[in-house]
Amino acid sequence: VWLLTACNVSVDLPVVSSDSDLQFPDLAKTWDEGMPLGNATVGALVWQRDSALRFSLDRTDLWDLRPMDSISGPNNRFAWVREQVMKGDYLPVQKKFDHPYNQQPAPSKIPGAALEFSLEKLGSPSDVHLYLNNALCEATWENGATLKTFVHATEPVGWFVFENLPSSITPTLISPKYSTGGDKAGNSVEGQDLRRLGYKQGTIDEDANRITYHQEGWNGF
C-alpha cells in the first residue's frame, strides 16, 4: 500500500538549507524532472502536468512476475549469458531475453498511481525547493500559499500540507489505465501498454477524508 496523508492544521516543519538543495522558479513539466521524494519502498515525484500539481506515486515491489518460458530453465543465469559472449554469439541471449520481453506483457513493473491538485485558481508556484537535509519539498506561491510534502524515512507513508490557501483545494486520485487505450506492443526501452497485462480496471472509493484505490493484479496479486 501507499498511504499519503493530508494535514489540515498548521504545522511547524523546520528546514535547513544546503548547497546541494534543488531549487527552481516553477514546477517541472515532465515527470522525469520532478522533485524526488522517497525511501527504499515508496517514492513520489512532484511536478506539473498540464494545469495540475501532480504527485506521481510508486512502490519498488509492484511487479507482475507471472511465469514466462523465456526466463525459466537452466539457462536463466548470468553464467550462460557470459558463455555466449565468450563464444562471440550474442543472438541466443537476445532470442531468450530481449525478443520475448518485447513481445510478452510480463514480467513487468507495475506503476502506482498519482495524486493531482488543480492549479486553475491557485496558479503555478513561484518557487520550488527540495531540502536535502530534511528530505522535504516546499512549493511557494506569490500570494503566500505554500505546500510542504515529504515521505517517511522507513515507512510507506507520505504527508502533504497546504497553508494560506485562498480557497479550498481537493485532491484527485488518478489510477493507471489497464482497460483503456491500445494494446500495441512496445519495447523494453519505450515500455509496454498496460492493457496488455489483462487486468480488470481497479476501483477508486472516496469518502469525506479518504480516497482508496483497489487494483487486482495477476493471479490475485
Describe each model-derived feature in a short phrase.
Residues L4-A6:
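C-terminal motif of bacterial Sec signal peptides marking the signal peptidase cleavage site
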Residues V11-F221:
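Aromatic-residue-lined binding/catalytic grooves and analogous aromatic/hydrophobic interfacial grooves
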